[in-house]
A protein has these predicted regions:
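Short hydrophobic/aromatic helix or loop-helix immediately within or flanking a transmembrane segment
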Residues: 38-42, 53-77, 87, 166
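Short acidic/glycine- and proline-prone juxtamembrane loop motifs at membrane-interface regions
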Residues: 128-137
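Hydrophobic alpha-helical membrane-interfacial segments at the cytosolic entry of transmembrane helices
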Residues: 11-17, 190-214, 247-264, 275-289, ...
Length: 555
């Protein structure tokens, strides 16, 4: 009897998951991170420049999505741009998942390929739905992996473009890309492939340098000094990496001990017991540990379940190493995942959460490795263990992706649709909808009165405000900037003072984990200048300070 081809069924399952995600993207309004990522492209749209006008360290990747957001601006203005960016990412993630699935189907079983694609599709750092640099970094790294696993020069060149895009998302990734590329160029068997990859890197680098890097070298160097002194990233890469490792040790100390014990039991069982039962005791210990650990962190960050998969599959990987069963595609994915995790850990101050960006790729490498094992008794048990654990992680991650909400109320409270402005088409809580409508009305009044040449500054944080108007950003970054920020004072020494300063009420944009999102500090030279020279206007959710030099519309 001919075996039925299961590949279309798995492709249909991925498609159904993407449709669910596309619908879910219409719920939940994040007042901070998600819109902040879009402000980089908004600054370019308003005629400002990277580095010279924007002082946040993660700005470079905006060059990747600036063209498509600019096209949206031309066609539709700013209305609904928030939801548009979400759906663009869902479409990009779905396309990448399908490409990954088709690529891996050539290397391993369809079910393994489906699990790998599903693990990617269900992951989003922090459950942020938009074009975050975390998500795009993961996407471009997987696109590189898909290209590297093909045998065509054009695919290798395209992989180089994706690798360069990943470096724009996380610049510290270059610390792994450059040595890896040099090493590949030194190996005769890989030299041609590495040469084509390098050409792809050079293509995107040339585009970025030509169209996005300011030509004022002196100004760039001076601004880089300020960017590197960013108060939220002043610890340095080594400090952040060490902090992330310490955090993982604290969180998963008992899991590490248990998986070491499971590994010892597994190796001894394979050596001493009959082949049919040799792997079972060790795998049973690992399975029990995984279940307990998954339950322990069931309410943790989306992506933490990947830790359990990686940790409790270590005994199985150790057995593969002992038996010298090495799959090259699996090795590529595991090395890539480790490099991604380390790069993110050096780039971010969010400790253990940072490694979760690389863990899906590492987990794919584990699954592909287990799928490549010969069909013997112990190896079959390893494959089944990995597949079952991956299914559990996949289901938990998908459920968390749907039910958890980042910086908004619980899912069942997201009932109020927003019908205008950048967040049009998204549903949020009644309180947030009222705040949004009130602030949007205030901004429309300001736009009707004052010229778009005036710079605006929202404090402490309201990134979507910059998306709602044509006023250029008058702050070093749209990220959290308080009135007493030393970086704000330095910025105003080299840039014009903002003509419009919006001081938000502390409770604006509040969420369960951030009850006072816009708490401020009313001190410093900038605040003193506002008090002395600016005219205050009271609004329901903010106080607006107007400069005497503010330009009226039509003047």
């Amino acid at each position: 009897m001919e075996k039925r081809d299961s590949r279309p069924l798995y492709a249909a399952a991925l498609t159904a998951a993407a449709v669910v995600l596309a619908v879910r993207a219409m719920y939940g309004f994040c007042w901070s991170d998600e819109s902040f990522y879009l402000t980089f492209a908004q600054r370019l749209w308003n005629g400002q420049k990277l580095i010279l006008d924007e002082w946040h360290p993660v700005q470079f990747y905006s060059a990747l999505f600036y063209p498509i957001l600019s096209l949206y601006h031309v066609l539709f203005g700013n209305r609904g741009i928030y939801l548009f960016a979400r759906e663009v990412y869902v479409a990009l993630a779905f396309g990448t998942a399908m490409l990954l699935y088709r690529t891996l189907c050539r290397k391993c079983a369809p079910f393994t390929s489906f699990l790998c694609a599903g693990l990617f599709l269900c992951y989003s750092r922090g459950n942020i739905w938009g074009l975050s640099y975390y998500n795009l970094f993961l996407t471009f790294c997987l696109l590189f992996a898909c290209s590297a696993l093909r045998k065509r020069p054009w695919a290798w060149c395209l992989g180089g473009v994706c690798l360069a895009a990943a470096v724009l998302c996380v610049p510290y990734f270059a610390l792994f890309v450059i040595p890896g590329l040099i090493a590949a160029l030194c190996i005769p068997k890989l030299r041609k492939r590495a040469g084509w990859t390098a050409s792809g890197i050079c293509i995107l680098a040339a585009v970025f340098l030509l169209f996005f890097l300011p030509k004022d070298i002196g100004g760039v160097l001076a601004s880089l000094k300020e960017i590197l002194s960013d108060p939220e990233h002043s610890g340095g890469p080594v400090h952040y990496l060490a902090a992330a490792i310490r955090d993982v040790k604290l969180l998963y100390y008992y899991e590490a001990l248990l998986t070491a014990f499971a590994g010892a039991v597994l190796l001894l069982g394979v050596k001493l017991l009959p082949k049919r039962f040799g792997a079972l005791p060790g795998l049973l210990v690992a399975a029990c540990g995984a279940v307990v650990s998954l339950w322990r962190y069931r309410n943790g960050e989306l992506g933490f379940a990947y830790y359990q998969f990686a940790i409790f599959c270590l005994p199985a990987m150790a057995l593969c190493w002992v038996k010298r069963e090495i799959s090259r595609p699996a090795l590529l994915l595991r090395i890539l995942g480790i490099a991604m995790g380390l790069s993110m850990a050096m780039s971010s101050n969010t400790e253990a959460i940072t490694f979760t960006v690389g863990l899906p790729v590492y987990s794919m490498g584990v699954l592909v490795q287990l799928s490549a094992l010969p069909r013997e008794a112990a190896e079959v048990q390893l494959r089944r263990f990995g597949a079952v654990l991956a299914c559990v992680v996949l289901c938990l991650s998908f459920a968390s992706r749907i039910t958890s909400v980042f910086r908004d109320g619980p899912l069942n409270t997201l009932t109020e649709p927003m019908t205008s402005g950048p967040a049009a088409g998204i549903r949020t809580t009644r309180e947030h909808a009222e705040q949004y409508a009130g602030i949007l009305a205030m901004l429309e009044e300001l736009e009707d009165t004052y010229s778009s040449e005036n710079r605006i500054f929202f404090t402490s944080i309201l990134p979507w405000g910059y998306l709602a108007t044509d006023f250029p950003c008058g702050a070093p970054t749209a990220w959290r900037t308080k009135l007493d920020s030393p970086q704000l004072e330095s910025y105003c020494e080299t840039h014009p003072m903002p003509a419009i300063v919006v001081v938000l009420e502390p409770q604006v944009g509040a969420s369960p984990d951030k009850p006072m999102l816009n708490e401020n500090s009313f001190s410093g030279r900038f605040w003193e200048k506002l008090q002395a020279d600016y005219t205050p206007l009271e609004y329901p959710y903010a106080t607006v300070y107007l400069s005497p030099n503010a330009i009226l519309k039509g003047v």
